[in-house]
Amino acid sequence: MAFLDYPPFDICTIQQLLTFIIISYTFYLTTRSIWRLYFHPLSKYPGPKVAAISDIWYAYHALAGRWPWAVADALEKYGDVVRIAPNEIAFVTPKALSDIYGSHNKNLENFAKTQINNHGNDEHGGLIWEWDPARHREVARQLSPAFSGRALRAKEATLHKYIDLFVERMTTLGGETGGVSLPTWINWLCVDISADMAYNREMNALKDMKEPPYLSILSGFNRAVVVTQMSWRFPLLSPLKGLFLAITAMRSHSHIRNHSRFQLEQRIRRKGAVEHLDFFEQLIPENREPPKDRKEMRHLEQVAGQLLVAGYEPPALWFYFTIYYLLKNPATLDTLTKEIRSAFKNYDEITSGSAAQLAYLSACLSESLRIMPGVLTGMPVVSPGAMVDGTYIPKGVVCQSSSLALARSPRNFRHALSFRPERWLQEDHALYDAQFAQDNRKGFQPFSQGPRICAGKEIAWWQSRVFLAKVLWTFDLEMVSGQQIDMARDLRGWGMYDKPEIRVRFRPKFVV
């Protein structure tokens, strides 16, 4: 037969084919690297060379849990604008922060969030992860009544309920020689508050004095978020991402969704019949029945889950860092404690309104908010073709700002690496220090700005002031000796921050 006359497909032919493929791919990578380094629209911006030719630099630091520090270090080394990926740049100036995230003229397209940071990995970004500006505005509009001043005042009793229970637990356990785990107890407090305020869900972490299943699952899924995001940067490796995710993390994703869906369905059926109105009330269907449409239900799941996480992780980080920096600065802690104890004759006088009158308390909270790393992702957005701090950024280029770099820059803040609450005081305050008068406070936007400004800004301040005032009115805080804690070295973050262990003693000063 004719086909038998053809020579066999021998090993030599296979070797030649493989050689051709390798040479061709090497040529492709070389020419692409040269183009990205010297001819790409972003080639004029400085930065690590490996970041200019590949996403490897980005992925390495993100997977190591050190992304905010890597970007801040690059900006410190290379200047105000740094290329951090082939098609991505980071800025450090307050003007760039305003241009990228601030409000824009209605006739201009907003800088839209990148889809790569849509943790939901589907068309339902909910609120926080929603990349489409129009859909984000619609959800934000629906939720806005839940964050009005009147609505927040109605939630204050819930806030006190959990903070008082935290104080009760510390009165019993906090004075022991070995102290208590600061991140553990703060996590429990914040997840209790957030779940109840988000959609009347009781976690009972403080009551039961143990990690609720939801929090354990959330922690287990922490690193998986970044692994998933990086797989989107390397599409050819996406099928292999399961090899890099622990079995527990994969199971966690399924369990957390199923458990949350059940809780959400229960909440929907209780519309208007709950102990207090929560943030989710505005989105519940009038018929009090879970939507039969899968897409609509998925959207509600996303929003509910994001409300819970947004009300848990940022406040927990804020509380944790504030106490840490106060303990590292005993004179500041002493000054704040005296302000609080002299302002209130008894514990019950402490409310969101009365605590807001304490200038040094607010200054300490502002300073910890400034100096802590802030958001993990840098909030990457896509340029519509616009000016950023005097430079035209072509359409399609991904931009982000580094809150950590802004805070660390001596061009923005004097003694930028030091915890100095005095920088936030007014001139008429006894502790005002004129050396901080030239600080560029426009670089301090911890809740973002413009269309994406955090809706929970006000309640976050309420929580933080009341928490710190009640804790320092009641306790003398001490860090257990012998701990070698270096935040610049030990802190890690993936989907959320992994806070280093700190043992703290809460010694009761007064009887509550």
From Swiss-Prot:
E.C. numbers: 1.-.-.-
Gene3D superfamilies associated with the record: Cytochrome P450
Enzyme class (EC, first level): oxidoreductase
Signal peptide location: none
Residue sites binding heme per the record: 454
Matching InterPro entries: Cyt_P450 (IPR001128), Cyt_P450_CS (IPR017972), Cyt_P450_E_grp-I (IPR002401), Cyt_P450_sf (IPR036396), Cytochrome_P450_monoxygenase (IPR050121)
Record bears the keyword Isomerase: no
Pathway assignment: Secondary metabolite biosynthesis
Listed Pfam families: p450 (PF00067)
Gene Ontology BP terms: biosynthetic process
Stretches of the chain forming a coiled coil according to its record: none
An MF annotation (GO) of this entry: heme binding
Keywords: Heme, Iron, Metal-binding, Monooxygenase, Oxidoreductase
Cofactors (names): heme
Domain of life: Eukaryota
Similarity annotation: Belongs to the cytochrome P450 family.
Database matches in PANTHER family: CYTOCHROME P450, CYTOCHROME P450 MONOOXYGENASE ASQL-RELATED
Cited function: Cytochrome P450 monooxygenase; part of the gene cluster that mediates the biosynthesis of wortmanamides A and B, reduced long-chain polyketides amidated with a specific omega-amino acid, 5-aminopentanoic acid (5PA). The PKS modules of TwmB are involved in the synthesis of the polyketide backbone, whereas the non-canonical C domain of TwmB is a bonafide condensation domain that specifically selects 5PA and catalyzes amidation to release polyketide chain.
Name this polypeptide is given: Cytochrome P450 monooxygenase TwmD
Gene transcribed to yield this protein: TwmD
